[in-house]
Amino acid sequence: MTQLDALKQFTTVVADTGDFRQLAQFKPQDATTNPSLILKAVQKADYAPLMRDTVGRFKGRALDEVMDRLLVRFGCEILSIIPGRVSTEVDARLSFDTSATVTRGERLIELYQAEGIHIDRVLIKVAATWEGIEAARELEQRGIHTNLTLLFSFCQAVACGQARVQLISPFVGRIYDWYKKSAGSGWNEAANADANDPGVKSVREIYNHYKHFGIATEVMGASFRNIGQITALAGCDLLTISPELLAQLAASDAPLARALDADSAAALDLPAKSFDETGFRYALNEDAMATEKLAEGIRAFAADAVKLEQLLLAA
């Protein structure tokens, strides 16, 4: 049995890509996209006709609408291949605007529904700022399921659980990147690998908290740098994995055991936690890593959204 097949026994495997032509070989249940992945895909010759067709069909419409329609076109193509859900992201430039995020999330769902896609097959991705979490709360109350992304801290996870969002995406690799860069020459790779990886430890803490307190929000580890990070989180509700790392898992037959377990988490002695807006902002501010990576992630996704718009204008 390959490691990929073994992982699927414990965890829902999700493909993290906009390149839907790669999906079939790995047979993922779900798929995730973001502006950076879509930008990467549309620059490939295979996807140029899809972008030109979208621009041609909706010429004269507002640029933000054309971009949303392109994201939905990719999402529909992905959903024709996978049995589960696709995550489509709201423009990161709205990360601090609750009302605008709700409006864009509703429009994305309307565009999917116009293509015959059931609402339960789409997760609206929103950055896990306070404003984003409040937008997700509103969307969930309207029956629209959400995926809270750019999640780097325990306080973000707790607030998402309080908002009863469908799913969160804690970023393993970017947490690892920050701690490795911060340590500089003092970084010990072996001592910070696998279960001791700072990104893995963050997801494990969140998973244990959710399972211990019966929080229904799904935990989907994301942003992996190596196979060790993935295998150390076997048993997590979902893991979203790049095609490159999926290929490595599919090529390996090394043993893989469950690392996270809901029953074990339920038996832990953990303190209850909750955050109001003031407490959330203070806790996030106290976490230098999370503050820096959240801001950096929003800037990067926003910049790629601008690049995507420029490609649409030039198409």
From Swiss-Prot:
Domain of life where this protein originates: Bacteria
Classification via PROSITE patterns: TRANSALDOLASE_1, TRANSALDOLASE_2
Listed under catalytic activity are: D-sedoheptulose 7-phosphate + D-glyceraldehyde 3-phosphate = D-erythrose 4-phosphate + beta-D-fructose 6-phosphate
Give the record's pathway: Carbohydrate degradation; pentose phosphate pathway; D-glyceraldehyde 3-phosphate and beta-D-fructose 6-phosphate from D-ribose 5-phosphate and D-xylulose 5-phosphate (non-oxidative stage): step 2/3
Its localization reads: Cytoplasm
The catalytic site is made up of K125 (schiff-base intermediate with substrate)
Q: Does the keyword Cytoplasm apply?
A: yes
- Predominant cellular place of this UniProt entry's protein: cytoplasm
Q: What is its EC number?
A: 2.2.1.2
Q: Which GO terms describe its molecular function?
A: transaldolase activity
Does Cytoplasm show up as a keyword for this record? yes
Which keywords annotate this record? Cytoplasm, Pentose shunt, Schiff base, Transferase
Q: Provide the top EC class.
A: transferase
Q: Which Gene3D superfamilies match?
A: Aldolase class I
User: What biological process terms from GO does the record include?
Assistant: carbohydrate metabolic process; pentose-phosphate shunt, non-oxidative branch
- GO CC annotations, alphabetized: cytoplasm
PANTHER family xrefs: TRANSALDOLASE
Complexes and interactors: Homodimer.
The family note in this entry says: Belongs to the transaldolase family. Type 1 subfamily.
Function recorded in the entry: Transaldolase is important for the balance of metabolites in the pentose-phosphate pathway.
User: Know the name of this protein?
Assistant: Transaldolase
